[in-house]
Amino acid sequence: MSKQEKSNVEDKSLDIETAAQVETAQESASGALEELSVEEQLERAKDTIKELEDSCDQFKDEALRAKAEMENIRKRAERDVSNARKFGIEKFAKELLPVIDSIEQALKHEVKLEEAIAMKEGIELTAKILVDILKKNGVEELDPKGEKFDPNLHEAMAMIPNPEFEDNTIFDVFQKGYMLNGRIVRAAKVVIVKN
């Protein structure tokens, strides 16, 4: 082999080595780029997961709030229906109370004629039926004579001194009071003792 051929072979060897080195460097650089790209992809994936978790938490919170709101609406509706059942007759009962008062006033009068006695018994029976119907529907009578005065249940119409009774004791009842399922329909009008 001539010198020139030898030189060409050496140049080709060098070119092959250089090409191999360049290729190895490119592969290393490409691998580094791929590694960097994988790390970036991992960071992006972590960021996406975090965003999705935050969205999921927000949706869970909104769902819990909606569930709580629906539960509150259901309870409010049940309470409204219950109150409508309990107090639906309140206006009607209030309008009947003067009728009961009138009947009771009429029954206080003493009668002597036999026909009037029979009529009074019929009125007493009618009054009893009316009061029983009201009781059956949750209306209770308040006849607080002798009890302690309670401004939530009683309306003081007058005060009288009486050493036989303690202060704020109900001495007399002008007009009975009525409650409907624990709610005052009409306060009892009373006379209380004030010494």
UniProtKB/Swiss-Prot annotation:
Its main location: cytoplasm. It is found in: Cytoplasm. The keyword Lipid biosynthesis does not apply. It comes from the Bacteria. SUPFAM superfamilies: Coiled-coil domain of nucleotide exchange factor GrpE, Head domain of nucleotide exchange factor GrpE. Keywords: Chaperone, Cytoplasm, Stress response. GO terms for molecular function: adenyl-nucleotide exchange factor activity; protein homodimerization activity; protein-folding chaperone binding; unfolded protein binding. PROSITE patterns: GRPE. GO terms for biological process: protein folding. InterPro entries: GrpE, GrpE_coiled_coil, GrpE_head. One of its GO terms (cellular component) is cytosol. Homodimer. HAMAP family: GrpE. Belongs to the GrpE family. Participates actively in the response to hyperosmotic and heat shock by preventing the aggregation of stress-denatured proteins, in association with DnaK and GrpE. It is the nucleotide exchange factor for DnaK and may function as a thermosensor. Unfolded proteins bind initially to DnaJ; upon interaction with the DnaJ-bound protein, DnaK hydrolyzes its bound ATP, resulting in the formation of a stable complex. GrpE releases ADP from DnaK; ATP binding to DnaK triggers the release of the substrate protein, thus completing the reaction cycle. This is Protein GrpE.
